[in-house]
Amino acid sequence: MAKLIKCINSAAGEHFSVYNGDCVSVASQFPDETVGFSIYSPPFQNIFTYSDSELDMGNCASDEEFDAHYQFLIKQMYRLTKPGRLTAVHCSDLPSSKWKDGVIGLKDFPGDIVRAHQAEGWIFHSRVCVWRDPVVEMTRTKALGLLYKQLKKDSTRSRMGIADYVLVFRKPGDNAEPVEQMPENFPVSQWQKWASPVWMDINQTNTLNVRMAKDNADEKHLCPLQLDLIERAVTLWSNPGNVVLSPFMGIGSEGVSSLKLKRKFIGIELKPSYFKHAVRYLEAAERQESLFTIEMASDETACEIAE
C-alpha cells in the first residue's frame, strides 16, 4: 500500500496503516488481491447513529438505502481479498418498531448480508452464533418480549434474546498460502471447541475502552467487538504476517488484536474522534504497552473532548 491514499487523515506504524475517510472511497484506492483476511462490524442499517456525516452509512433514510450503499463496499472487499481467503462480518437480527416498520418484531439483517455478499460472488462459508445474555439485553433495552411482566400477561409476545453472529464468506479460487494450524499451537481440543456452531464463551466485556471516544457533538452509539472474538477469527483464518483489513475500524479493536497476533493491519474509519484514539491504541500495541496504560491516558483525553 505504498501509493498515496486520498483521505482526510492517515497514520502508520511499522505494521499498520490507517486512514480517516469514507471506507468505499479509501478502499477503492487499494490494489487488487492484497488482503489476507478482513473482519468488521458494519453499521446496523439505520438502527444506530454513529455521526452526523453524510458519508456515514448509518445515516440512511431506509433499509434499502443502506443496502445500496453497503453493496459498494462488499464489491471493493471482494476485489481486495486474495483468492481462497475470507471475510468475517459481525451482525445480529435487528428489532423492528411499530412507528418505523409497522410491526414489532425482528428483521433478518444477517440474511440481507448473506444475499448481498452472494450477489458479488462471495461463497457463504460459515455462520457462528455468539451467545449473549438476555438479562443484560432486557436491562439495557427494556424490550417488551423479554420482560417478565409480559410473560405473565401474554407469553405469545415473549421472545428469546438477540444473539450475535459472525458470517464468514470465501472468495472463490485456490488459496496460494494455506493457513496451517500446528498441533502444538492448536490442539484438537481447541478445534473441537472452536468448531462449535455456538460460541458460548466470548466475554462480552472484553473490549477496548470506549469512554475516551465519546464526542458530545454527535456520538450516539459505540459498541466495539470483543477482543477474544477478533483474536479467535484472526488466528483461525489468517497467517502471521498477513494483512488484516477492517473498513469500519472504530477505535481500533481489530487492529490491536491483529498486531498482537503478529499480523499487519489496515483500517479505515470515517469519524475523526474514533480515528484519533484508534491510532493511540495501535501505537501502544506496537510498543506492546499495557492496554490498561493507554486506557488511562485516553480517559484523560475524554475529559478534554467533553469540555
Go through the PLM ranges and name each one.
Residues S290, A302-E307:
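Short, intrinsically disordered terminal tails adjacent to the first/last structured region
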Residues A2-H277, E307:
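Core catalytic lobe of class I
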Residues N20-S25, E295-A302:
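Conserved SAM/SAH-binding loop
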Residues V279-M296:
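DNA/chromatin major-groove-contacting recognition/catalytic segments
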